[in-house]
């Protein structure tokens, strides 16, 4: 009989006053008993809408049934038949707007905690089994994957399972893409990402780092080297700024740079050689998950005051509610309906404040959200010594500029057809390189679709 409790089984977390001063993972995960209890809430629907809400089509009721039975290994095998990275998606996927939003238990009460259960299964397997996947017999056909973020890793894994000889070309010195440079340790421990990369290598995937495609090699040169198809999953790492006065002052930086220094280069550790700005008061401009990540890192790096400055209201914030909740618990102050108009500096060329104007919401704009309108005469100044711009990112133009015939849209995203083929034959693309900055799970879905399309293309 199903567990008809209306609320999710709570997941243990570090206390806010403790975690705000360390980079250890905030969410501690379910115990086996908690997972089995929560799995009992699943009704095992005959027509599961939750599966329709999953971009990688995990057979959700099936794996949850195995969790309820205590057969965690079988649950893992069900998940990984369609999801190559469950330990990652279980942590950072916005389940509340995807699979869990379709759960019928959410009609009266809370949905089943699908993400927490997926994370539990992946963690249990890593801690108790961690068998490396077997290598599929190679068909001898070479495929190149540019980028090792969620799209690239998923595409490479699916192609390797089909027998292709896959090589990943990663620009940075560590594989993982946004998973290692963008998402903080307290949300996604890097050891977990490294373990997923080791699994890929066990499948026979070659992972080459420090390989900037467009500089070290071009797409055309990859074809000359014998690769029969290329998947571009290079992400969207080009930060956006506001173009307001004062953005060139010392103490203004992009969230992309700030998070890369903190996460990838581990600048928060005593032994790190990478410098990272140490601040007393920080304004993070933006309202997405990246803004929350940057603000929470600033708090952990010793800032006394951290502000989220966002031009719309909290209801319009794109950040996950969980991330907003955690940020507030950790003492971060939200300055909503505020828009920066100038960054102020002293004679030393350093930031000493940010001038903002208060906003009100008008009619919806093209995004579907109500358009913010400045309130005349409402300017005020926040005393800060650091401003972090978390306004989104766009794809880097390097690959496009070095690949004749590769077209992009006005936002820099690669143009693809329904099969993720770009305007160059044999070159496929997916994830943020196409859509601009989006979620990890959508990038994984694009990588999965790209692998299937490449397989079909090479079999023609």
Feature locations, PLM:
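Local cysteine-cluster metal-coordination motifs and their immediate loop/turn environment
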Residues: 40-62, 86-107
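FAD-site-proximal beta/loop scaffold in flavoenzymes
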Residues: 248-279, 364-437
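A conserved FAD-binding loop/helix module that cradles the flavin
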Residues: 294, 433-459
């Amino acid at each position: 009989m199903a567990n008809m409790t209306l609320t999710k089984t709570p997941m243990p977390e570090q206390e806010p006053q403790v975690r705000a001063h360390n980079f250890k993972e905030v969410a501690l995960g379910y115990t086996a008993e908690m997972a089995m209890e929560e799995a009992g809430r699943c009704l095992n629907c005959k027509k599961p809408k939750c599966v329709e809400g999953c971009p990688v089509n995990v057979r959700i009721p099936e794996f949850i049934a195995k969790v309820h039975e205590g057969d965690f290994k079988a649950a893992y095998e069900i998940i990984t038949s369609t999801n190559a990275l469950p330990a990652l998606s279980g942590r950072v996927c916005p389940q509340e707007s995807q699979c869990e939003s379709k759960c019928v238990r959410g009609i009266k009460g809370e949905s089943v905690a699908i993400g927490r259960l997926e994370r539990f299964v992946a963690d249990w397997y890593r801690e108790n089994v961690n068998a490396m996947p077997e290598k599929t017999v190679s068909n001898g056909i070479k495929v190149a994957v540019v980028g090792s973020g969620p799209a690239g890793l998923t595409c490479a894994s699916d192609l390797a399972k089909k027998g292709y000889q896959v090589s990943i070309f990663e620009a940075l010195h560590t594989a993982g893409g946004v998973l290692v440079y963008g998402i903080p340790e307290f949300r996604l421990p890097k050891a977990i990402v490294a373990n997923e990369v080791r699994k890929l290598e066990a499948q026979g995937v070659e992972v080459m780092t420090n390989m900037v495609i467009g500089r070290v090699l071009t797409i055309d040169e990859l074809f000359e080297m014998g690769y029969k198809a290329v998947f571009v999953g290079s992400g969207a790492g080009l930060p956006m700024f506001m173009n307001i006065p004062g953005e060139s002052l010392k103490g203004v930086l992009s969230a992309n740079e700030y998070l890369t220094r903190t996460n990838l280069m581990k600048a928060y550790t005593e032994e790190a050689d990478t410098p990272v700005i140490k601040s007393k008061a920080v304004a993070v401009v933006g309202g997405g998950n990246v803004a929350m990540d940057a603000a929470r890192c600033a708090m952990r790096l010793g800032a006394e005051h951290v502000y989220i400055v966002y031009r719309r209201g909290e209801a319009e914030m794109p950040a996950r509610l969980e991330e907003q909740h955690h940020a507030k618990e950790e003492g971060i102050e939200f300055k909503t309906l505020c828009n920066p108009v100038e960054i102020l500096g002293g004679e030393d060329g350093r930031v000493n404040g940010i001038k903002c104007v208060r906003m009100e919401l008008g009619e919806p704009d093209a995004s579907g959200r109500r358009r913010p309108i400045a309130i005349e005469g409402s300017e005020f100044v926040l005393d800060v010594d650091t401003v972090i711009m978390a306004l989104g990112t766009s794809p880097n133009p390097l690959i496009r500029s070095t690949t004749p015939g590769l077209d992009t849209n006005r936002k820099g995203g690669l143009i693809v057809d329904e099969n993720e083929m770009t305007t160059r034959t044999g070159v496929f693309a997916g994830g943020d390189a196409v859509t601009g900055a989006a979620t990890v799970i959508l990038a994984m879905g694009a990588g999965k679709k790209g692998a299937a399309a490449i397989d079909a293309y090479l079999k023609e």
